[in-house]
Curated annotation (Swiss-Prot):
Pfam families: Ribosomal_S8. One of its GO terms (cellular component) is ribonucleoprotein complex. GO terms for biological process: translation. Part of the 30S ribosomal subunit. Contacts proteins S5 and S12. This is Small ribosomal subunit protein uS8. GO terms for molecular function: rRNA binding; structural constituent of ribosome. It comes from Chlamydia muridarum (strain MoPn / Nigg). Keywords: Ribonucleoprotein, Ribosomal protein, RNA-binding, rRNA-binding. Gene3D superfamilies: 3.30.1370.30, 3.30.1490.10. InterPro entries: Ribosomal_uS8, Ribosomal_uS8_CS, Ribosomal_uS8_sf. Coiled coil: none annotated.
Length: 133
């Protein structure tokens, strides 16, 4: 796996492509930030589960994707908001409601990576990483 400057965009793109190809899982290089994002996706039912494994002295994360009974992906869209070239920060009051509360916003806050409603409840803002619905 090559080095990318935006590992979050890489994660979202790999998930998007794997869902279109109806793959069961993806493998991606592990980082604490990516694990926190995938953990939030799992808590909200967007991915089935994930595990972290070490292979050839590299830590990899295997993310198992989730599909409905009709083999349609549970995730309809993933959108990267804040990018290395253009950071987007929001206050707690400006955290977006995604797709009529059917989706989630993922933020990097001083209290760690949080989902939008959790950050709103804690009255904390931060960098708006991505939107998922």
């Amino acid at each position: 796996m090559g080095i990318t400057s935006d590992s979050i965009a890489n994660l979202l793109t790999r998930i998007r492509n794997a869902l279109m190809a109806e793959h069961l899982y993806i493998d991606i290089e592990h980082s604490k930030m990516l694990e926190a994002i995938v953990r939030i996706l799992k808590q909200h039912g967007f991915v089935a589960h994930f595990l972290v494994k070490e292979e050839n002295r590299k830590r990899l994360m295997r993310v198992f994707l989730r599909y409905g009974e009709d083999r349609r992906p549970v995730i309809h869209a993933l959108k990267r908001v804040s990018k290395p070239s253009r950071r987007v920060y929001v206050s707690a009051a400006k955290i977006p409601y995604v797709f009529g509360n059917m989706g989630i916003a993922v933020l990097s806050t001083p209290q760690g990576v949080l989902e939008g409603s959790e950050a709103r409840a804690k009255n904390v803002g931060g960098e708006l990483l991505c939107l998922v619905w």
